[in-house]
Each structure stands twice: as C-alpha cells, then as structure tokens.
Amino acid sequence: MAQVPVSKEPRHHLVFENDKVRILNVLVPPTDTTQYHVHSTPSVFICFTKTHTGSQRINEQPEYSTSVAGNVWFEDLSEPHIKIHRVWNMDTSVFHVMDIELMSKEKSFVINTQAIHHAHLQIDSPWARAYSIQLAKNEDLRIKNQPSDFILVAINDAEIKMVENGKESTSFIKASEYYWINANDIFSVINAGYARADFTLVSIK
C-alpha cells in the first residue's frame, strides 16, 4: 500500500523548517481521511480541538479516540519506532493538531530543566522539553538569556503584547500561531485580554 512521508501528506501543511525542527500544521476536515503516511522522527504533538477521530496503522485494526484541546505529547518515532498510519475525522468540525518534528541527531540536553515563571514542565525527553503556560490578564512570560531555542505555540485565541529584543507589538493571535525564539533572545509576552491565554513552550535540543 502506498505511503508518503508525513511532510508530503496533503493535510499536513509545512509552515516552518530549519536545521532543528520541521513544523506541520495538520488540518483534517469532517469525514475526510489522510493518506497512509510515515512518521520517522521524534516529534512533539499539540492538539487544538476536541474531535472524534479514527486511526489505523498499516496492516492493523482501526482505533478510535477523542482528542483534547491543549493536549501535548511526545513520541520517539525514529528507527525502529517508525509509524505508518492514516487518520480520519469522524466529527462535524475540523481536526487540528501540530506536529513538531525534531531533526537533531543528538539525544541529550547539556543543561537542566529551566526555571521560567508561569512555565510548568510537561515533557522532558532527550530531544525536547515542553512546558504548559497559563497567563491570566496582565500576567507575562519572560525568556531571557536562555541557552536553548524555543517555540511558543498559542493553544487558544488571545490578545497579547509581545516584546522581542526591544521591539514591541500588540496583536490578536489564533490557536496554533507560533513564535520561534532564538537562544539568548530577550522575549516576553503579556496577556492583554480578559480571558486566560494558554500556550505550549517547546525547548529545542
């Protein structure tokens, strides 16, 4: 049965790539099914919707589940753990998830987990760490002189004020919008709205 690399599967949209990560924004419409595709790198997955879905590994029986908005998990999908599967949407709205493929061949951090105010460690893997962040109105996340690169991903829609290396901006962001933060950058984001702003912060090896 034909399979394609996950980055070439039509519902997996490449939105960012460098030598460390490849970010795929995955959108599966109601009643739609992906092609069989191959996951072959360690990956962090971030879900943005509550959706009833089915999935099937090649030559295996289907499995069914309901995704949870804000759920974040890690899978080591490098050899010999490669996954070949397809996914279909059994619900009435779009299934939305982000796949952050981790491209580094090294498997260990040289630094301990980092203490960042409002950031709570969820995943501690050899390739990446992920932190959950919940900001009430006027609360902020500050990243300064950290030795790792980061990806900050919005879990829900929010109004924010952001300062990056002294440059300030205010915007309304949507779930799945992301920011790449270079090591040693000075970066902060403030919740400028009334509703809670949720994020996932991924520290990259």
Residues covered by each model-derived region:
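A short glycine-rich, His/Asp/Glu-containing loop-to-beta-strand
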Residues: 10-35, 41-45, 115-145, 149, ...
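Short acidic-glycine-tyrosine-enriched beta hairpin
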Residues: 16-19, 57-79, 166-184
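Histidine-centered metal-chelating micro-motifs
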Residues: 32-35, 71-86, 139-141, 177-190
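Glycine- and acidic-residue-biased ligand/ion/polar-headgroup-sensing regions
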Residues: 40-59, 146-166
